[in-house]
Amino acid sequence: MSNNIEKVAVLGAGTMGAQIAGHLANAGIPSCLFDISQELAEKGVGILTSLKPAPLYKPKNIELIEACNYDQHLEKIKEVDWILEAVAENLEIKHKVYTNIMDYLKDTAIVSSNTSGIPLADLTKVMSDEVKKRFLITHFFNPPRYMRLLELVKGPNTSDEIYNKMASFGENFLGKGIVHGKDTPNFVGNRIGVHGGNNAVRLAIEMGLTCEEVDKLTGTIVGRPKSGVFRTTDIVGLDVHASVSATSYNNLPDDEAR
C-alpha cells in the first residue's frame, strides 16, 4: 500500500507532541518536532529515551526526529506533507501557531490538531477557506504508541478525500482504530472520559474514599486500564484534565449532569 505522507511537522514538543513524533518514527516516518526554543525541542526528543512505557519501538528510531524551533526552522514546513499541531490547550496559542505557519504550507499539505476537545469551528477561525479544506482533528490518546484509539473529526469544509486519506493512514500505517467523531464538545472519548472521571471524584468525596481505593475500584477489576481514575488523570496531566472539563462545562449549559 502506498503512502504519500513521507514527512511530518509536529508543532509542540510536550508530552503528546514528542510521543506522536516517536510513534511516527516507529512507522518509519521522519518528522520535525517544533517548540518555541531549540532547548525545549531537543528536550522533547531526548525524553523519548527515558519515558515509561517506552515510546520508541527501537532506540535508533529517534534518529528520524529532528528538533526544530519556530525562529530558525519554519522553512522546513515547506517540506512536509502533514502538519500536526499539539501545543497547549489554549485557543489563543493555537491561533498564533497557525498564523505563523500559514505562509510555509505547501498546497497539498494536510493540517490537523491533536486538541483534546476544542471545537474545530473555533480552531479554524484564523484559516483561509483553502486551508480549511485540508484541516481536521487527529486526536491521539496518551501514550500514543500503546493507545489504539485515534479520533478523527472533520468540519463542514474538510475535503472528504483528505479525511478518508487520514483515516486510512491512521489505520494502515499507524496501527490505529479510528473513531469518527463530530464537532461536538470534547468529541467522543473525552466527552465520556471527563464525565466518568469527574463523577468518580465526586462519589469518592461523598463516600470518603482515598485515591488508591478509587483506582482499585475503577481499574482492572471492572475491565479498565490498571491506572484507574486518579492515576489516569495524573498521566494525562491535571492541566489537560481541567481544560477538557472546562470545555464540557462551558459548552454544555443544558447537560443534565451539569
Residue ranges, per PLM feature:
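N-terminal glycine-rich phosphate-binding loop for ADP-containing cofactors
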Residues: 1-258
